[in-house]
Amino acid sequence: MKTKAGFYDYSGNADDKTLSEILARLKASASAKKAPFSPQRLLLAMINEAALCIQEHIATPTDIDIAVLAGIGFPQSRGGILQYADEIGIDVILNQLNELCGVYGERFFPAPLIRRMVAAGFLGKKTKRGFLEHA
């Protein structure tokens, strides 16, 4: 049974002023720059969001990797998005997020967990410790 208390506006009003205002602000903001399609930019955003989920105890790294493998068809050969991040290097991820943050704004601001991992030397496979532990 629907309670009509969720995400959607069930008032029957086709013109949602709140949504229109948000979209207008996004279009006017600097972060709405036109840019060519970049798979790496999408992956970095997903890695950053995954780090926030781990930091907020919403999911474990293993949960996230299984979800992207089963849910969005992430290549099994990569082992999941966090396995992929560990292969690239958490320090490299941090540097790339910082660059994107400078260009596209705060939506690419690196998750505090990523900053702490780099500061602690948890850089991924090259240090045998990242989002996951590596033998």
Placement of each model-derived feature along the sequence:
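N-terminal glycine-rich phosphate-binding loop for ADP-containing cofactors
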Residues: 1-135
